[in-house]
Amino acid sequence: MALQAPEGLKRTLPRLADDLRRRGYSVIISGDPCYGACDLDLAARDRADILIHIGHTPVDNTERVIYEPWLVDGDLTVITRVIPHLREKKVGLVTTIQHIHLLQKAVRILRDAGIEPVIKGPFARTPCPGQVLGCSFDAAKTTKTAEIIFLGTGLFHPIGIQIATQARVLACDPITGRIEQPDADRLLRIRYGLIEKARSAQSYGIIVSSKTGQNRRALAEYLAHLSDKAQLIIMREVTPDQLLNLGFACYVNTACPRLAYDDQVRFPVPLLTPGEFEILCGVREFDQYEVDEIV
């Protein structure tokens, strides 16, 4: 069998491999970078009978892959402490797969305080109710609530939820205990500046990912038809050096949406989302801005 895990969990693989060998299995470890269930190492799988992917849930129906989520406990007093900050009696409740097992306890805490939590799902890319990904906010959008609690770490997901839903979002971190309200306006100002900078570009590279869960070829072909200065590029790993070597004045990303939002500072030229390129080409207005998701 082949073992794969994202960067933060890779050091668990040698110990797991040793345990499996003692049980009589032949094991190969995938050492390539991995950023999610959208990034399966099919080459490693094809050298084994099965690929065990640790840390995520499936986003598609790739054969001969077993998914084993990595659950992380946390302190749910953060939910108790957020209650006085709520303005609504009915709130959406979402989390990432790492904390999915904490949702029902959070539900009980909220209900005991007279708050009715709304949890939606499952969906195509998020098989657990209440689960969101950095590229999929269906569980948040379908709550149809004016206020949403995100239980998890970091602000990327809460900002995406705010843009996707227009709801008031409260981010509750069960690890640090912090409660934050994300500022999506700052991100939108940055993205607007990049769109304006890209208007003067004389060439646009439309990136198509070769990764199983990130390939949006049809979308990329549609975007390429919006400008006679656009060319399709197929890539597995999108890195600053690769983009610099290709030499386009601007790139449009149809691979992992987090590349444009999280990693723009690393890239030498604007890296736009599909919706941002539509704004640049006049297909939509900026007030119709949508966060990029893989659906």
Please give the residue ranges for each predicted region.
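Short loop/edge segments at beta-strand edges and connector loops
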Residues: 29-31, 121, 234-237, 273-275
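Extended, charge-rich low-complexity interaction segments
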Residues: 50-51, 55-63, 141-159, 199-213, ...
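Redox- and metal-dependent alpha/beta enzyme cores, enriched for Fe-S-associated oxidoreductases
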Residues: 155-230, 237-245
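Active-site regions of enzymes building and remodeling cell-envelope glycoconjugates
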Residues: 63-70, 115, 166-168, 230, ...
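Beta-strand cores of modular interaction/reader domains in eukaryotic scaffold and signaling proteins
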Residues: 2-4, 53, 205, 231, ...
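Cofactor-cradling patches in redox/metallo enzymes
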Residues: 7-16, 25, 210-220, 230-249, ...
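Peripheral docking tails and interdomain loops at the edges
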Residues: 175-179, 184, 257-295
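The feature marks the mature, well-folded catalytic cores of soluble enzymes
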Residues: 2-180, 189-192
